Amino acid sequence: MMSKLGALLTICLLLFPLTAVPLDGDQPLDRHAERMHDGISPKRHPWFDPVKRCCKVQCESCTPCC
């Protein structure tokens, strides 16, 4: 009985090694949460490049206005 369990455990470890399980240290950092923690909003971040849309006529219905 024990040899069957040992063989089954060996086969399972060969097919699915423990190194295939993702650990918390393998996860990428959340840069957005890190920026918000530093107090820099995404709109004020130096890498943020907003697209400016301006209206040529009166600014009644366009957003954002110049």
From Swiss-Prot:
Expressed by the venom duct. One of its GO terms (molecular function) is toxin activity. Its main location: secreted. It is found in: Secreted. It comes from the Eukaryota. Disulfide bonds join 54-66, 55-62, 59-65. The modification 4-hydroxyproline is found at residue 64. Residues 21-53 form a propeptide. Belongs to the conotoxin M superfamily. This is Conotoxin Lt3.5.
